[in-house]
Amino acid sequence: TNVLKRVFARHPDVYALPFEVRFLLDPGGIIDFYTSFSTSWSPFLADDRIQRLQTLLTDVEREQLVHRLPDWLALRCGRGRWVAPRRYAGWELARHLPHFRAHNRRLLRALVEFRYDGAWPGTASYTVAPEVAFAPPQAPNELRELLSNYLTTLFEELLQNTNHRVLFLDETWALLFMRELHELLPRARFIHMLRDPRDVIASFSQQRWCPRDRVEATHFYLELMDRILAHRQDLGSRYYEVRLETLVADPRLTITNICEFLGLAFIEELLEVDLSQPHSGRWRSEFNTHEQQTINALVKEKLLQLGYPSENESVEN
């Protein structure tokens, strides 16, 4: 749920982008590049990773006018399940992040020593005028410093440009990469909004990137949570958990505690977001009898671990 972003977007010290940035955590993005480039290297591997990073950064920079109609149609065909829209349709980060394109070019220049005409046996089929980017290996600490400076500059310029102090990012997979994000952005803090696993599964099954089958969506959810919970202690005081149900039951106390965690002053405007429809317990009406029995059995241990009631217990905040 992005309810916390809606809450804290009302704070005068907080800036919240209206979308996920995508270039940070998606395949071929900054974290993917960071975790792979220094662990294994060959000229071909390096070129492939550079090309993927460059393609992703270009795709999210700005949408061309010619793409808007087909993208609009694709997104309305089963919400993109029938026909996938163009990659990153609608993303135009250059409109929001100051000098985004210039910083991207500067980053790529720092990574690539030179380019030359050439092709690998595995170069994409029928590439016109193929080119190879030669990117020499970098020590992990050198790569970390380079990428950290890139991200820090991007985000600090955004905050200066908008006259805010704190940037609130709502990234779907951020909690899976807390350690890596902390290495590149050591001042970052992470908030994990917990929710009844069965309600999360009900929500997941309606997303175009998740299985529609709710039992499959349960396995999807459990793998995510196992990884997140295994690493939550690594962040120490920079990681904070809060239940959606607790936020709804006592918003003032919950938001005050989050403000303290973020180093923000509490203001009354944060309570103006409507929290009356959290869809708590939605799984009871959306799951059929077989799904309820199967999924309750699958998430039994996770319910206990997270402190949520089992099938026949009532919810306690």
PLM regions and their residue ranges:
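Short His-Asn-centered micro-motif
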Residues: F19, L169-T172, L244
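Conserved helicase/translocase P-loop NTPase motor core
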Residues: Q138-E180
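Conserved nucleotide-sensing/catalytic segment adjacent to the nucleotide-binding pocket
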Residues: T35-L65
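Conserved phosphate-donor/acceptor-positioning beta-strand/loop module used by diverse small-molecule
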Residues: D170-E171, F177-S205
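PAPS/PAP-binding and catalytic site of the sulfotransferase fold
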Residues: T1-D13, E180-L185, D196, E241-F266, ...
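Conserved substrate/cofactor phosphate-moiety recognition/catalytic segment
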Residues: Y15-P43
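PAPS-dependent sulfotransferases, especially Golgi type II membrane carbohydrate sulfotransferases
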Residues: D71-W72, G78-E145, S205-R208, M225-E241, ...
